[in-house]
């Protein structure tokens, strides 16, 4: 009897302990939810106040300039300390100091090389920074200097890459030598930019070419008609809309659209031929792409070499400066509350990946 009573008492105590635990956990969750809600509410108020205060202020970026010679020097010194013994290090240090002293005494002024980067998406969004970087360097660059653009782009919108190319043309017009380095891809609009360089250097397996124009869009008119849905397209002007997504496309509209593509292609060919007259433009303007090895034979590039190799060589005889214009992020972008910005970047990211494979 006593053993049975003890077992029942322990069972009741265990049951009470579990209930108390559940109640405590529920209260804790409720408290945590209230705390999170309060913190979020405070953040929303602070962000709103900051946004109202910053409204109307002009957002400006900042030009960042780094000397690449220091980077290469650090790599060299790191290798020296890892490989050489104390005596060899001492001798190397003396030799470097002596060479620097002789250069200073002789009054030798090394030419400057301004290094830019362009990583292009469909909209050539990097043009926003490129235009300011070019404006900045042209205030200092001389015909004895050089501009090196490390270019990566599979192309995109005609007008966007037309503007990016026009920015590079400013360098040529100023009489400053322009070298284009391509490590992975410069196709379609990317090659439109590359051809402006006085010298084009590519990696052996970089993808180049795609001198052509493409446009594609779906048409759901028959689907809408099947479900008795009308979609009106009203225009003023015979060719205001040639092809549409929802309206009924006509053969006349298709012919006009194709004519516009051909016109754009001819302008593209003329632009490339203007800057690289050595090309057989009709032979290479077929929309095809070539790897660097084959592109060299067709004179699409002038030399096979990676950008790393080229810059390391130039660092031995010139002062290298890397320029990057960083756009000032808006408050919404910094806090991460702008869903439309995030969505836009997500879509552009995936379209760019597709673009790199199809070379629009």
Q: Predicted segments — roles?
A:
Residues 190:
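DNA breakage-rejoining catalytic core of tyrosine-based enzymes
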């Amino acid at each position: 009897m006593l053993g049975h009573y003890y077992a029942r008492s322990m069972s009741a105590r265990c049951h009470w302990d579990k209930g108390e635990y559940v109640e405590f956990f529920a209260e804790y969750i409720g408290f945590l939810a209230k705390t999170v809600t309060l913190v979020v509410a405070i953040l929303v108020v602070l962000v709103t106040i900051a946004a109202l205060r910053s409204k109307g202020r002009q957002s400006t970026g900042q030009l960042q300039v780094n000397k690449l010679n220091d980077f290469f020097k650090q790599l060299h010194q790191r290798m020296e300390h890892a490989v050489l013994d104390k005596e060899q290090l001492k001798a190397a240090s003396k030799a470097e100091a002596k060479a620097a002293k002789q250069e200073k005494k002789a009054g030798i002024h090394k030419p400057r090389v301004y290094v830019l980067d362009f990583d292009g998406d469909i909209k050539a969004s990097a043009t926003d920074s490129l235009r300011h970087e070019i404006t900045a360097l042209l205030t200092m660059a001389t015909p004895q200097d050089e501009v090196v653009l490390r270019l990566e782009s599979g192309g995109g919108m005609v007008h966007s890459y037309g503007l990016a190319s026009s920015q590079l043309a400013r360098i040529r017009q100023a009489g400053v030598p322009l070298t284009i380095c391509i490590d992975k891809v410069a196709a379609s609009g990317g090659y439109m930019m590359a051809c402006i360089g006085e010298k084009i250097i590519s990696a052996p397996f970089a993808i180049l070419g795609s001198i052509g124009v493409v446009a594609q869009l779906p048409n759901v008119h028959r689907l809408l008609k099947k479900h008795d849905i009308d979609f009106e397209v009203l225009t003023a002007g015979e060719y205001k809309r040639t092809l549409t997504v929802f309206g009924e496309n006509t053969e006349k509209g298709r012919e006009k659209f194709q004519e516009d593509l051909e016109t754009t292609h001819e302008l593209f060919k003329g632009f490339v031929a203007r800057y690289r007259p050595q090309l057989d433009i009709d032979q290479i303007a077929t929309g095809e792409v070539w790897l660097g090895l084959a592109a060299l034979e067709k004179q699409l590039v002038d030399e096979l070499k990676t950008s790393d190799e080229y810059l390391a060589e130039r660092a031995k005889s010139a002062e290298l400066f890397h320029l990057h214009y960083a756009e000032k992020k808006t408050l919404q972008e910094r806090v991460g509350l702008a869903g439309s910005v995030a969505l836009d970047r997500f879509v552009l990211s995936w379209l760019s990946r597709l673009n790199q494979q199809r070379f629009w």
